[in-house]
Amino acid sequence: MRFFDSFSPKLALRIVLSILSLVLLFHLTVMVGIVPYKIVWGSKLHSINQMLVYEWITILITAIIFLIFLIKAKLVKTFLPLAIVNFLLWIVFVFYSINTLVILTSGTSVEKAVFTFLSFLMALSSYRLAKEKSFVSWR
């Protein structure tokens, strides 16, 4: 656990904001057909309509998670107390921890190679920020 304590909140915040930006961009490229939808979701998607539903849900969830981190960084003003923001970050930590395990069992090597590492970084960074007892400056 010492590593987590030396992992700065500012670095964790920069990591999550960068990764989430890239994830949003990636899913948008899947939606518009630049990246073939057959290589995502463990190759389980069978139609463009199915892909669009999955991608819209993913983009919505990612945007909500992005917003939580923006609130933690005080880049978005909110009425939510810090305790609620931190609770939401613990939920994000659990989500990305489970997501990391799910990706490891997915069907495609591309997902395993790239997204396992990114998901693990998100879990690690979420953990670090959830432990932080104050809002975090990203600068």
PLM ranges: what are they?
Residues 2-13, 29-54:
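Interfacial loop at the N-terminal end of multi-pass membrane proteins
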Residues 11-26, 120-122:
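Alpha-helical transmembrane segments of integral membrane proteins, especially early/N-terminal helices
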Residues 22, 29-31, 46-74, 90-94:
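Core segments of alpha-helical transmembrane spans in multipass integral membrane proteins
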Residues 67-70, 104, 127:
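Membrane-embedded alpha-helical segments of multi-pass transporters/permeases
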Residues 75-89:
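Loop-to-transmembrane helix junctions at the membrane interface
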Residues 86-102:
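Hydrophobic alpha-helical membrane segments
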Residues 98-114:
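Membrane-helix boundary connector in multi-pass membrane proteins
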Residues 121-139:
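Membrane-water interface at the C-terminal end of transmembrane alpha helices
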